[in-house]
Amino acid sequence: MSTNAMQTTARTLTAEPEQTRPLTLAALTQTLAALTSAPTQRELDALLRRLELETEELRPHLNFKPHTYTRRRLFRSDLCEMLVLCWMPGQRTAIHDHDGSYGAIRICEGSMAEEIFALNEAGEVVAAETHARAAGEVTGTDVPDIHRIGNADPGEQTMVTIHVYAPPLRVINTYQLGSAEVGECWPDDPANPANS
């Protein structure tokens, strides 16, 4: 990306003195809605690091289900989208990528297990690294990024995460460990049980 392109993108966010001010969920939504060009992965990461959530602010968006994690869209434009995901203990995604979208994830409550995968020479999915993420942490998803995330708590602690993606998710590619086969999942499909 050229310096001019980076400067233009940076100007679509907030003025310099404002870039360290904490953001409420409403302020983050307004910031995303005001964008005139796609934010970078680094900018999404920085925005989620500034997020200061009150439990009451998230409560209307929370929906836990016993058999699957849930996703609820909080904001969407042509440039980006923001989702809240709710996880019961032990729930996790399939191994997947975001088919060209990049983003950032903030753990709001609970702890997250993040598994990163790679493709071997035969194109098969193999485990690469594992990370434990605590409440308040932010992690990024770049392109390409094959991973699996989930609620690491074996007990009764639920997990809540905020995800911001650019561009908005259209297709999620799914994988099986040790296989080169690639499946597809459509996040907006009403039949997707994760959509709340």
Question: Predicted regions: what is each one?
Answer:
Residues 1-54:
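N-terminal leader/capping segments at the start of a protein or of a new domain
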Residues 60-91, 138:
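A short glycine-rich, His/Asp/Glu-containing loop-to-beta-strand
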Residues 75-77, 95-96, 122:
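Short loop/turn motifs at secondary-structure junctions and domain boundaries
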Residues 89, 100-115:
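Glycine- and acidic-residue-biased ligand/ion/polar-headgroup-sensing regions
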Residues 94-96, 114-115, 141, 147-153:
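Short beta-strand His + acidic residue motifs that chelate non-heme Fe in jelly-roll/DSBH
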Residues 104, 119-147, 187:
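Short acidic-glycine-tyrosine-enriched beta hairpin
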Residues 104-106, 155-171:
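A short hydrophobic beta-strand segment most commonly corresponding to one strand
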Residues 162, 169-196:
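Extended, aromatic/histidine-rich regions of cofactor-dependent oxidoreductases associated
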